Amino acid sequence: MLFSLLGFLLGGLLFHALPGYAAEEPGIRWNEDRIVALGQAVAPSGAASSGSARLLARRGAVMDLQRNLLEYVQGVRVDAKTTMENYMAHDEVRTSVEGTIKGVEIWRSSWDGEIYSVWGGFSLQKVRQSGASRIPGLASRSVPSYEGKGYSSLVLDLGDIPFEPSLVISLRSASGKKIYGPEFVDEASFVEKGMYRYEEHTGSWKSSFLPSFLKGTPAWAEENALVISQDIRMNEVGEIVIPDEAAEVIERNSFDFRIPCEVTVITKTAALRGFLNSFFVLRRAPGLSSPEKP
C-alpha cells in the first residue's frame, strides 16, 4: 500500500538539481541533521527512443529514491525503544511523513546511458515535526534568553561509550532523578534543532602528556559551556547518567539551557582548550562565585 502511494506522490515531487552536491553515501546523518538517499533505475529495453528511455529511467529512479527514504524514516529511532515506524501507525504522523517524501529535494542526478541515479533527502527537522505530536511530555514552553550569567549550554562527552542517536534522549543523575528529557524542552525548539547536537570525533579526548585528572573543553564549544566528560555512563534503558553534583549544577544554573535544547552529545572530544581539575569537567561561568563541588 505504501509503495502504491509513492507512485502517486511522484507526480508532486519537487525536482531540481542543486550545484555543489556530489554523490553521497546514503543513510541517516545524525551529525548533519539530515537523511540522504540514492535512487536508481535501468532504462527499459522497449522504450521508443533514447529520450523516452532516459525519462522512464529517471521516473523509476525517483520512485526508488522515495522508497528508500521511506525505509530510512521508518528506521529513525525516536527513543531507546521506539522508531518512527511505530509512530507511523498514527494517521497524522503517516500523513506528515508522506508529505515530506512527496516534497523531497533532488540534489544531484546522473545518466550513463543505461542507469539513471538520483541523490536526495531532507532535514531531520521534518521528521521531528512529523512525530512531535506523539512524544510524551513535549509541549510549548517559554524560551529564556541567555544574559551572560551561568552556563549557556551543556556538552555531554561520552568518549568511547556506545551511543545510538535518537530524536529523544533522557538524562538522569546517579541517584535516579530525571534531569533532561522531552518534558524539559520547548516543542518549537525541539522541532527546529532537535534535543541535542550530535558530534563525532575520532581523536582522543585526553592529551597523551597530561595526567588523567586534567581535561579540557572542546575547541568548538562555547566559552560558557558546561562540559561533563567523566563519571558518565549509559544505564540499562539507554539513558545517560551523570554525577549528582553535575545534575545539581544544571538545576541551579541561572539560564535553563534545557528549554531551548542547548545541549550537545559527542562520542569523542576534539582538540583541547584550557585545563580543568575536577572529576567532571566544569567551567567557571559568569555569575557563579565558584565551581560547585570540584
Language-model segments: residues:
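Bacterial N-terminal signal peptides
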Residues: 4-16
